[in-house]
């Protein structure tokens, strides 16, 4: 009856909203995905209860000044083209409160035009999330669990809500890949229009995604080429991670790169050290090895100086600096991205330029990776390559550790690397070939 309804309204919904927005102000007013969930919950509760003050707190922050709250989060957590600063894994995660609350705002207060706010940033963010994937799986840089894909609750909701707003037939292509939609009016529209054959291929493309609220804190470069795979996207993708740190979930991997080809991750990123929701593995939380290995520079395809991680492994320091994106071109025939950073190590400037040329008569993809480090002092430079596959051959003499298994170092990730074999290169040159899924890959290096 009415008494029960009032009791639930007052003792469940209002009490929870009060706890989140007035007793937990430090979390509620953060510019962070934790606050996005809190503001979305309070705002949607406000709409349910007809409480305009609650909605205002959610949109504008606990003091309703606009310096915090949901609207401010859309302005500071995404770059102008919809890249979320923590990376694709958390972009997927945060899209749920962003889009579900935005959908509620649109239903209750269409005059706010939330989907037009900041030049349509939330719809850009949804499309950018899809662009940051290969065969449906997100590029696993920063803290990322590698088996998260477009087939997740956040993206079922997000694709349906975005389609309801835009009627973009490319989103139907993604919904078809997902194989399901959600029980809401926009979900019914997705199913109906898919059945009517209105889907068009999603435009996977080479693109430069700026980082930072003003787009001036580095970038993520995505270079795509080759004939389309089963998912309708180019078969070869190179990612250059020239972005900002991405707060606490960021890794120390400035100017790192990854490569996908032939349906597989070839030059790989470890992602996060975590068994999500597995109670026996530290309650499903991040493992200690996330700090000691997964975040370390040597765990990535980046230049490591003096066996230490970028910024000394200090996330607060790293948040203050980012690479400078020097050049980007998606011109057919020669795609290129170039960036530099002089703050990852004191007194060391690093520039990296990956190129993807298309050469007549060469069927397989080719990547040229130019790395230059300069310093007034002598340093040890290590350039790891983490790849997927089985080693076939190499053109240098190795000294194999068959009786014992030493480790490479004592700290900064090096303590986790076993030395299987070592070699001295002839004139700084060498080549190594491995096989993955019926295709050979050769890495040639010269210094």
Language model feature labels by segment:
Residues 1-130:
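Aromatic-lined, polymer-binding surfaces characteristic
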Residues 13-22, 127-133, 293-306, 371-380, ...:
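A short, hydrophobic secondary-structure junction motif
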Residues 30-33, 139-145, 317-319:
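Short coil/turn segments at secondary-structure boundaries
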Residues 51-54, 104-112, 135, 228-231, ...:
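Secondary-structure transition/capping motifs at alpha-helix termini
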Residues 113-191:
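C-terminal, helix-dominated tail/subdomain
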Residues 172-404, 408:
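Catalytic and substrate-binding regions of extracellular carbohydrate-active enzymes
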Residues 378, 386-447:
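Polysaccharide-binding surfaces and accessory modules of carbohydrate-active proteins
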């Amino acid at each position: 009856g009415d008494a029960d309804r009032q009791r639930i309204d007052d003792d469940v919904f209002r009490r929870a909203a009060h706890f989140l927005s007035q007793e937990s102000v430090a979390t509620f007013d953060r510019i962070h995905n934790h606050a996005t969930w809190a503001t979305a919950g309070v705002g949607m509760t406000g709409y349910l209860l007809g409480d305009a003050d609650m909605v205002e707190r959610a949109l504008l922050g606990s003091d309703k000044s606009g310096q915090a709250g949901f609207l401010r989060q859309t302005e500071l957590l995404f770059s102008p083209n919809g890249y979320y600063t923590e990376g694709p894994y958390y972009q997927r995660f945060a899209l749920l409160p962003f889009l579900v609350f935005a959908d509620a705002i649109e239903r209750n207060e269409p005059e706010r035009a939330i989907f037009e706010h900041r030049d349509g940033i939330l719809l850009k963010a949804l499309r950018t999330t899809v662009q940051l994937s290969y065969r449906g799986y997100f590029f696993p840089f920063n803290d990322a669990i590698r088996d998260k894909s477009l087939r997740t609750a956040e993206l079922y909701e997000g694709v349906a809500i975005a389609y309801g707003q835009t009627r973009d037939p490319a989103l139907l292509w993604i919904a078809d890949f997902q194989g399901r939609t959600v029980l809401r009016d926009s979900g019914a529209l997705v199913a109906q229009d898919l059945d009517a054959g209105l889907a068009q291929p999603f435009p996977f493309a080479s693109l430069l995604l700026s980082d930072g609220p003003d787009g001036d804190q580095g970038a993520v470069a995505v270079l795509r080429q080759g004939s389309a795979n089963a998912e309708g996207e180019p078969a070869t993708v190179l990612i250059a991670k020239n972005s900002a740190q991405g707060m606490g979930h960021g890794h120390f991997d400035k100017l790192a790169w990854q490569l996908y080809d032939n349906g597989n991750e070839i030059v790989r990123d470890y992602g996060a050290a975590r068994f999500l929701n597995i109670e026996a593995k530290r309650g499903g939380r991040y493992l200690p090895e996330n700090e000691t290995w997964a975040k370390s520079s040597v765990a990535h395809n980046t230049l490591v100086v003096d066996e230490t991680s970028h910024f000394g492994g200090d996330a607060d320091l790293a948040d203050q600096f980012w690479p400078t994106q020097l050049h980007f071109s998606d011109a057919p025939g020669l795609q290129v991205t170039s960036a530099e950073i002089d703050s990852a190590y004191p007194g060391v400037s690093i520039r990296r330029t990956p190129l993807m040329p298309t050469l007549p008569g060469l069927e397989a993809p080719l990547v040229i990776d130019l790395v230059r480090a300069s310093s007034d002092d002598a340093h040890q430079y290590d350039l790891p390559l983490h790849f997927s596959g089985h080693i076939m051959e190499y053109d240098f003499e190795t000294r194999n550790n068959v009786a014992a298994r030493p480790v490479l170092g004592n700290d900064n990730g090096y303590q986790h690397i076993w030395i299987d074999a070592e070699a001295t290169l002839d004139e700084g040159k060498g080549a190594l070939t491995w096989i993955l899924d019926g295709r050979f890959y050769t890495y040639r290096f010269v210094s």
